[in-house]
Amino acid sequence: MPIPQDQIDPDAAKVVRRLARSGFAAYLVGGCVRDLLLGRKPKDFEVATSATPPEIKALFRNCRIIGRRFRLAHIFFGQKIIETSTFRANPREVEPPEDDDAPLDALQGHGDNELYIRRDNVFGSAEEDARRRDFTINGLFYDLDGDQVIDDVEGLPDLERRTVRTIGDPDVRFREDPIRIRRALKFSARLNF
């Protein structure tokens, strides 16, 4: 499934290429990759990178860091924003360092009174980041310079089958965020899956 280069937003391409020239891994990610593969015009473009929010800000003077728990970089091109996030690992799979004094956000579990500890800014690899996403069709990365789709979550076969499928156990994923049920229905209807 090739992605036509002329359909890629030039400002998103600038962000990816500047990050790459500075030594960071950087890819288009998520809905824009899905839409391009389906021959649809993406409503926006997102970038995922190995650069941390401060490293992103140092490269782009038109950048603003947003979010408290989940830090993102918004890179402005006029009225357009290219949302740029750092690859993240699943916080439950990462052991915090023993000397880490950073505060943890404690969240009450839903229904079973379990206490969940969530550290949303645990940085990871591109593969770990893909596995954190909601659906396989949104977990696709696109390497601009290599002109290849990176699929660590079996999203390409699901696109071909026109299937919306969670990454991981659906019961767990929907309990983590019940809004995902609505998103699955929305994608299914909007994409005619």
Where does each model-flagged region fall?
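Catalytic cores of the polymerase beta-like nucleotidyltransferase superfamily
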Residues: 1-193
